[in-house]
């Protein structure tokens, strides 16, 4: 197969940042994505409807390509009220609220310290039909970083699912076979996004032969048995699993340092990266559902009606890309890609 035409895909988890870098991140995400769920972990975080709508206007002001639509998210804190949830839902532009356990990832210090603090907000979300997006890791210092997702499933997520059975929730950027099993066996209100980099790489790619900081992300890359489970889930056709890049840019100097930031940039070639994974798994026929159908179906939104075409054509990823006044090193920098959007 040398060309594939699929319904225009969406990205159900992306970081665009803010300020002078927006022109670059919006350029890349809108190149062929129809919609994207925009992460709210700015400084300061997007904690209410007003700040979400303001952020949306800043994104649109960059002149995204095509008919790209940013779908906004508010950042849950210990103080998020039920009233704010209903206000956000009524705005027509806020599609979800994000649960960051405090300290779990980049700019999550204002996140939730205990689920007990957000029960009224979760109840309001269940009533309003708003999605809960979850960074599924515990943050206790005595829990090994490679085990934090598994422990979260057992100690935090399972009780939420039990206590709020009608709350639709997305376990984002899953990284373990445990998460695949949890989502598969949960009811129809639990879905998951899977990133391209967690499908393509495991912790050996990051650590063997030298530390490669551009593979460092959170949740951290796991061993290959978990990578294999993710590939099987993504290519299975199960509608619970869908595309979410978690493309998370940092300036080159903030990655290549003694204390580098977590995040991998993939928005420059997202669907091309996924296409390589699906081709290697002999599952190109499942790419459209994963990329273009399962996400909007889970969110109860219409599927896109136009298409994009990928061609089996080699092209080289730039070594660096513009990122405001800095540069970002994209995933597969300097390497050849196998598929190209034409």
From Swiss-Prot:
Q: Where does Zn(2+) 1 bind?
A: 13, 15, 98, 246
User: What note does UniProt attach to the cofactor annotation?
Assistant: Binds 2 Zn(2+) ions per subunit.
EC no.? Answer: 3.5.2.3
Q: Which reaction does it catalyse?
A: (S)-dihydroorotate + H2O = N-carbamoyl-L-aspartate + H(+)
Q: In which pathway does it act?
A: Pyrimidine metabolism; UMP biosynthesis via de novo pathway; (S)-dihydroorotate from bicarbonate: step 3/3
Q: Name the cofactor(s).
A: Zn(2+)
User: Which sites bind Zn(2+) 2?
Assistant: 98, 135, 173
Xref: SUPFAM superfamilies: Metallo-dependent hydrolases (SSF51556)
* Gene3D superfamilies membership: Metal-dependent hydrolases
Active site residues according to the UniProt entry: 246
**Cellular component annotations (GO), alphabetically ordered:** cytosol
Keyword Hydrolase, does the record have it? yes
> What biological-process terms (Gene Ontology) are attached?
'de novo' pyrimidine nucleobase biosynthetic process; 'de novo' UMP biosynthetic process
Top-level taxonomic group:
Bacteria
Q: Which UniProt keywords apply?
A: Hydrolase, Metal-binding, Pyrimidine biosynthesis, Zinc
Q: Which CDD domains match?
A: DHOase (cd01294)
**Single GO molecular function:** dihydroorotase activity
Q: What class of enzyme is it?
A: hydrolase
Query: InterPro entries annotated for this entry?
Result: Amidohydro-rel (IPR006680), DHOdimr (IPR004721), Dihydroorotase_CS (IPR002195), Metal_Hydrolase (IPR032466)
- Write down the Pfam families for this protein, in alphabetical order: Amidohydro_1
Q: Which family does it belong to?
A: Belongs to the metallo-dependent hydrolases superfamily. DHOase family. Class II DHOase subfamily.
Protein function:
Catalyzes the reversible cyclization of carbamoyl aspartate to dihydroorotate.
Q: Which NCBIfam families match?
A: pyrC_dimer (TIGR00856)
Assembly, in brief, is: Homodimer.
The identity of this protein, by name, is Dihydroorotase
The organism of origin for this protein: Photobacterium profundum (strain SS9)
What gene, per UniProt, encodes this protein? Answer: pyrC
């Amino acid at each position: 197969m040398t060309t594939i035409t699929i319904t225009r895909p969406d990205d159900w988890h992306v970081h665009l940042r803010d300020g002078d870098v927006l022109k670059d991140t919006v350029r890349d995400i809108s190149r062929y994505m129809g919609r994207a769920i925009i992460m709210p972990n700015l400084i300061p975080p997007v904690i209410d409807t007003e700040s979400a709508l303001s952020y949306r206007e800043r994104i649109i002001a960059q002149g995204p390509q095509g008919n790209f639509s940013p779908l906004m998210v508010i950042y849950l804190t210990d103080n998020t009220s039920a009233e704010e949830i209903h206000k956000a839902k009524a705005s027509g532009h806020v599609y979800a609220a994000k649960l960051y356990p405090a300290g779990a990832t980049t700019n999550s210090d204002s996140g939730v310290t205990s689920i007990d603090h957000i029960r009224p907000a979760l109840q309001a979300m269940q009533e309003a039909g708003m999605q809960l997006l979850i960074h599924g890791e515990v943050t206790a210092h005595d829990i090994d970083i490679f085990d934090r997702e598994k422990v979260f499933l057992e100690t935090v997520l399972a009780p939420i699912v039990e206590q709020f059975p009608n709350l639709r929730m997305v376990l984002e950027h899953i990284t373990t076979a445990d998460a695949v099993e949890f989502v598969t066996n949960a009811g129809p209100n639990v879905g998951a996004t899977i990133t391209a980099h967690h499908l393509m790489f495991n912790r050996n790619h990051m650590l063997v032969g030298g530390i490669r900081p551009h593979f460092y992300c959170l949740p951290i890359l796991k061993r290959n048995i978990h990578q294999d489970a993710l590939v099987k889930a993504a290519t299975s056709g199960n509608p619970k699993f869908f595309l979410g890049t978690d493309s998370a840019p940092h300036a080159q100097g903030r990655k290549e340092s003694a204390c580098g930031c977590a995040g991998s940039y993939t928005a420059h070639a997202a669907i091309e990266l996924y296409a390589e994974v699906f081709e290697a798994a002999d599952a190109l026929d499942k790419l459209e559902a994963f990329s273009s159908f399962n996400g909007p179906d889970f969110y109860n939104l219409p599927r896109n009606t136009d298409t994009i075409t990928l061609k089996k054509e080699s092209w080289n990823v730039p070594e660096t890309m513009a990122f405001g006044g800095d540069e970002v090193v994209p995933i597969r920098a300097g390497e050849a890609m196998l598929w190209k959007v034409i």
